[in-house]
Amino acid sequence: MTDYLLLFVGTVLVNNFVLVKFLGLCPFMGVSKKLETAMGMGLATTFVMTLASICAWLIDTWILIPLNLIYLRTMAFILVIAVVVQFTEMVVRKTSPVLYRLLGIFLPLITTNCAVLGVALLNINLGHNFLQSALYGFSAAVGFSLVMVLFAAIRERLAVADVPAPFRGNAIALITAGLMSLAFMGFSGLVKL
């Protein structure tokens, strides 16, 4: 049980996918202008990353390894992610049309989010079992969502702040992301994996 807690805390805070591994930067910068959109994208990404981790582990363990087709791993995982994203898109469209309109093009772009593919590939490379894979996918997504929501809240405050003209827009956003990354480095000694 302690191992699973350490995996969760380590993935969310210490080895955050956005601020430490630099995966998922496109939606991190693109969808984080409004808190509402960032929260919706975080929830959708959490669902996709968790489900994609589970499906990728199952396909790798039950199909690719027994048939000695591990060279098709990346292609198979991309296809799995595409199917999971389409399923998520249908669910979001039915349950929350407002969120579906807010996310716009970013929802299908979860397919190309390198964090989703990264979590599937890292699960295999780290040798996780089924429960660890599911938890790792969920933890990575929680860390991604946490950083997105924090960053969106900061960006909303910066939008009304008195920022010097050369730093407005993406410049201050990148500086803020760098400062967030430094803040998360404070967790680096918390968990040793």
Swiss-Prot record:
Q: What is its EC number?
A: 7.-.-.-
Q: Which PANTHER family match?
A: INTEGRAL MEMBRANE PROTEIN OF SOXR-REDUCING COMPLEX, ION-TRANSLOCATING OXIDOREDUCTASE COMPLEX SUBUNIT A
- How the protein sits in the membrane? Multi-pass membrane protein
Entry keyword set = Cell inner membrane, Cell membrane, Electron transport, Membrane, Translocase, Transmembrane, Transmembrane helix, Transport
Q: Which gene encodes it?
A: rsxA
Protein name in the entry:
Ion-translocating oxidoreductase complex subunit A
Q: Does the keyword Transmembrane apply?
A: yes
Q: Give any Pfam family that matches.
A: Rnf-Nqr
Per the UniProt record, the lineage of the source organism begins with: Bacteria, Pseudomonadati, Pseudomonadota, Gammaproteobacteria, Enterobacterales
Top enzyme category: translocase
HAMAP family annotated for this entry? RsxA_RnfA (MF_00459)
Q: Name one GO biological process term.
A: electron transport chain
Q: What parts of the sequence cross the membrane?
A: 5-25, 47-67, 72-92, 102-122, 134-154, 171-191
Q: Where in the cell is it found?
A: Cell inner membrane
